[in-house]
Amino acid sequence: YYERNIEGVSAAVTNQIPGDGRILVCYQPEKHSSAVLQEIRYDPATERCERTTLKTYDGFNAGNPEKVRQLFADAAELAPAQNYGLIIGCHGKAWIPVASGSLSYSMRRSAEDDLWAAPPGAKQTRSFGDKGYELNITELKEALEAQQFRFDYLIFDDCFMANIET
């Protein structure tokens, strides 16, 4: 799924794109054991789209807010720009927080108003990421606020989270 999305972006990067914009991708090709920060760009010398690894992260956990904060800082340092955009592609749990775990079969079949009710004492929030590597939206917010720049847009390409950013 993710590789296909990255290939789709790469197919759109041609010599017909004006300007000097840069596209960076953080991808975990080895499941959850590592990550790579890559740049997707058109190379006039080879006349094709190239993917170049800018940085490799060993033991990268996308569910760790500090690791995510550092990833954003690294991207800004390696590709300084006037404007930034962010697309997050992973699994999503919509309005269900990380601490809720997996939904049981009976919960999936509950009435709609029961399914989205927060547990007693829990903050209503959202999470995304694979089981054990999830990040709450509030943790993403903190990682974003720690940066010296702001993203111009944020898109979730996640199950259950399409259009949740609005």
Predicted regions and their residues:
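Residue-identity detector for glycine
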Residues: 8, 19-21, 59, 63, ...
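N-terminal extension/subdomain marker
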Residues: 1-82
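Catalytic cores of nucleophile-dependent amide-cleaving enzymes
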Residues: 87-96, 111-166
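Short, solvent-exposed loop/turn and secondary-structure capping segments
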Residues: 36-37, 96-102
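Aromatic- and acidic-residue-enriched segments that line the glycan-binding/catalytic groove
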Residues: 101-112
